[in-house]
Each structure stands twice: as C-alpha cells, then as structure tokens.
Amino acid sequence: MIYVIYVQSGREHDVVAALRDKNINAYAPAHDLLERKGGVWRMVRRMIFPTYVFVNSEGITDELYYTVKNTVGVLRFLGRPPTPLPMSEEVRLRWILDVENLTVSRGYINSGKVTITEGLLKGREHCIVKYSRRRKRCTLYCEINGVAAELEKI
C-alpha cells in the first residue's frame, strides 16, 4: 500500500533520505526536463509531485506513524487517519512511481495529435490535457487521494 506524506516545499529529498536511513521505503519521483534560461536550453531535474513523498508500507503502525511524523520536514499524512491510496489510483500512478530515473519525453505533433516516441510519457498520450510547443511542455491530468490535479512541466 502507498501512503502519501505532505512535506515542506523543497525538502522532499531530505525527507526521503531521512526516512530511508530509518529503513522506511520512501520516494519522491523526479524527472529531467528542458528549461530555457538566458536563451539557453538546459537539462534540470524537477519533482513530479512537489511537496509530496510516497511511502510503501503494509500498514501504518503507531511506531511507523510517529517515526515519519517526527522526521524534520514532514507536515502530515494525507487522510485522517492516514489512508493508503485507493488501488485504482495506485494502479494509475504506478507507471510514474516505479521509475527511478525519469527522462525527457520526445515526440512530434501530426495534425494536432501529440505522439510521444520516447521517455516518461511514451504510451501515455491519452493523459495529456494540453501541450505548449514554445515551452516544450505537456500538462497531464491525474487524481491523488480523490483530488484532481494537473501535472505541469512534464
């Protein structure tokens, strides 16, 4: 089961490292992306779900709850009491959560239809809500714990 933790912005990697030091299976998926700064395109690494960390666990015991809750940077678990992602959402997000190194997606547009040839979004064209050719970015639609969200900068 996957539990979602809300953390301080910019502290995702610190929280993941601290939880892994305590033998807790935690991760915060990031991906490579092209950004233009000063007229030059650069490859940068960005969080897919900023301020969220995911924890794999068979259940939440009191010991696990307080170990995670007392970690520096953790604000709270999503859900009261902490509830795992429903299986339907877990299955939909598994393609992002299972991959360690998410690379830049590349593709083309033909007659207004986006086709991805390589990278994170290959085979996921149906999730794309909009595409910016100038910024070289796609926006995806997904749900996390019943809350609809659009993932930008992918």
Predicted feature descriptions by range:
Residues 1-113, 128-154:
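Acidic-enriched and Gly/Ser
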Residues 117-125:
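Short coil-to-beta-strand transition motifs
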